[in-house]
Amino acid sequence: MNTTPDGRPIPPAHADERTMLEAWLDFHRATLAVKCSGLKDDQLRLAAAAPSSMTLLGLVQHMAEVERNWFQRVFAGQNVPPVFGESNHDGFALKSGRGLDEAVAAWQAEVSRGRELIADAGLDDSGHLSEQEAGHVGDQGVSLRWIMVHMIEEYARHNGHADLIREQIDGTTGA
């Protein structure tokens, strides 16, 4: 597999649908990790710009929760609590004692668990939405294909946020 100079896996130009979806999802996961690399704890906690309180550390925590929600709760139908506790259901809230290492470990654990849950599933296999989520896309559930495309979109959107936050912190752009 080819990688970018910063170590992110380059998605193949030609592959079957499943391989392509997994590769793009992994590329965007790696992009978030790159955006957080080389920074000190206080930098990871810097908010983007008022009135937003979004931080790079909060984005990592949020994506851990997003991974858990879509692969464990929706696709596998598991009843699992929020990664960082009930009071932080979306993952954005920061805790003074939790730094990047702990947040990344939780995020990577959720990524690994998601991979396990979908390893033998087909792209047309369906997950089940909560009533709140069903209101957005309908009550027929969503296919694994839909979930993977949504996850790519979720990472791409938040990587754009991460790009702006990182540039504000130390001027680093790209990736």
Swiss-Prot record:
Pfam families: MST. Keywords: Transposable element. The keyword Chloroplast does not apply. Transmembrane segments: none annotated. It comes from the Bacteria. This is Mini-circle uncharacterized 19.1 kDa protein. It comes from Streptomyces coelicolor (strain ATCC BAA-471 / A3(2) / M145).
